[in-house]
Amino acid sequence: MSRSGARVERVPLARYTTLGVGGESEMWFVETHEQLAEAMSAPYRILGGGSNLVVSDSGVPERVLRLSGPLAERDLTPDPELSTPDLIVTGWVGGGVPLPGLIRALQKLGWSGLEGTVGIPGQVGGSVWMNAGTRFGEMFDGLHTIEIVTPDGVRQVTPDDLKWGYRQSGIPRGHVVSRVRLKLRPSTPEAVLAKMEHADQARKGQPKNKTPGCAFKNPGGVSAGKLIDEAGLKGTQVGNARIAPEHGNFIVNLGGATAADVHALLALIRERVGVPLELEYELWPEQLGG
């Protein structure tokens, strides 16, 4: 237990990533801004839902911060001062809230704005930090206010304050998205569900194994998956990691894969594809660049 009451444990990070790889590290489970400030007083990294992440087999030397308690709770009550008949602005949604559960809750309320992100794993904070999305929508489609914790304090910003874009929020690395307010449009549960099912149908070709998600960003509007397919790499395997036969831009853990296996596949893809590819994965530590 830390001075401010945060729970501190050494844990295998593989347990907390969707890929299921990663060595042991010191994890801080933070529930308050005070605990977050203490945890950020030494070198640290932020771990949300563990998607889009490949962690070294030896873990990382920094503290690993995970939002929990009140910072993983949601208040979807419309704010009476900010909401209008055509716009719903919610109470605060913690950065540690699981994104899939939030999307389901919004659908049941009949509130539209984030249904295009259906199927994305992870937590709200990390999804906002990287502006996670699909071709049907992204996190910044439904954001009103973002609360960011930095080593210098807490500040609240709007999307207009940030230089956000495709798979990027403009929030500096190491700054923590602690809470957000959502901005949504009133609709019906049936209409929102229909949009979610349409997006889900388009994702049916994606693998169901343990995976971090898409490995590379689409270069210049061209599908990275298509480029990898054309290079003849679908199904290529190193150790227990494989480029998914269903979709070339996904790497899956067949069981017992290591980060080294995944890194080898990423390097092979970059070598064989004829255009520069920028990683969508985050690497801990940053070994491949890009």
UniProtKB/Swiss-Prot annotation:
CC per GO annotation: cytosol
FAD-binding PCMH-type domain span: 20-187
Oxidoreductase keyword on record: yes
Catalytic residue list: 167
EC number: 1.3.1.98
GO MF term set: FAD binding; flavin adenine dinucleotide binding; UDP-N-acetylmuramate dehydrogenase activity
GO biological process, one term: cell division
Pathway(s) per entry: Cell wall biogenesis; peptidoglycan biosynthesis
Reaction catalysis annotation: UDP-N-acetyl-alpha-D-muramate + NADP(+) = UDP-N-acetyl-3-O-(1-carboxyvinyl)-alpha-D-glucosamine + NADPH + H(+)
Family statement drawn from the similarity comment of this UniProt entry: Belongs to the MurB family.
The protein, known as: UDP-N-acetylenolpyruvoylglucosamine reductase
Organism listed in the record: Deinococcus radiodurans (strain ATCC 13939 / DSM 20539 / JCM 16871 / CCUG 27074 / LMG 4051 / NBRC 15346 / NCIMB 9279 / VKM B-1422 / R1)
Organism placement in taxonomy: Bacteria, Thermotogati, Deinococcota, Deinococci, Deinococcales
Gene that encodes the chain: murB
